[in-house]
From Swiss-Prot:
Source species: Mus musculus
Record: active site: 73
Gene: Gpx6
Chief location bin: secreted
Domain of life where this protein originates: Eukaryota
Keywords: Oxidoreductase, Peroxidase, Secreted, Signal
Protein known as: Glutathione peroxidase 6
């Protein structure tokens, strides 16, 4: 009888775990598609001060982490963590690029000229200055999305099956590969081809660990 009860208990635990995995609508990370046509080097963007157009070709040979950012988001604390990632992975030829966007909860309402001041004195505040390049505010989804994000999204599966509440999402039309919220991340390899994509809630320390694991794997190939 005890063996039957123990077996039944194990089966119930297994089924509960399986159900939890099945019901979980997002993944912390996904690998991008194989055989992608094109590279990020075909695109570029203006720096946040509008003083320079940067062709992403200048990052050829580097690993690039593209991040859509916002100043008044619950995830804005990610900013200092991105500074740490940039500092610790710079010796490994990794560079972070940030793209302010106001499409998720209207959480980046300021002008380009106001964003850096807001980061320094409001959120995260405390004199914070990003040690990575920020670009002009723009769309990452919808009819007016930046072309580089069209390329990144079409190169990688979405990290979640679900979108947030429609009243907090400001673009049209919505597509399955769209970015779900602020602080999604895309890693691009030194050949300009997307490698990985992370869910916005994935901790930066996990992103950094995933990148290091990828770098170790590629260095031995």
């Amino acid at each position: 009888m005890a063996q039957k009860l123990w077996g039944s208990c194990l089966f119930s635990l297994f089924m509960a775990a399986l159900a939890q995995e099945t019901l979980n609508p997002q993944k912390s990370k996904v690998d991008c598609n194989k055989g992608v046509t094109g590279t990020v080097y075909e695109y570029g963007a203006n720096t946040i001060d509008g003083g320079e157009f940067v062709n992403f070709q200048q990052y050829a040979g580097k690993h690039i982490l593209f991040v859509n950012v916002a100043s008044f988001c619950g995830l804005t604390a990610t900013y200092p963590e991105l500074n740490t990632l940039q500092e610790e992975l710079k010796p490994f030829n990794v560079t972070v690029l940030g793209f302010p966007c106001n499409q998720f909860g209207k959480q980046e309402p300021g002008k380009n000229s106001e964003i850096l001041l807001g980061l320094k004195y409001v959120r995260p505040g405390g004199g914070y200055v990003p040690n990575f390049q920020l670009f002009e505010k723009g769309d990452v989804n919808g009819d007016n999305e930046q072309k580089v994000f069209s390329f990144l999204k079409n190169s990688c599966p979405p990290t979640s099956e679900l979108f947030g509440s429609p009243e907090h999402l400001f673009w049209d039309p919505m597509k399955v590969h769209d970015i779900r919220w602020n602080f999604e991340k895309f890693l691009v390899g030194p050949d300009g081809v997307p490698v990985m994509r992370w869910f916005h809630h994935t901790p930066v320390r996990i992103v950094q660990s995933d990148i290091m694991e990828y770098l170790n794997q590629t260095s031995t190939q």
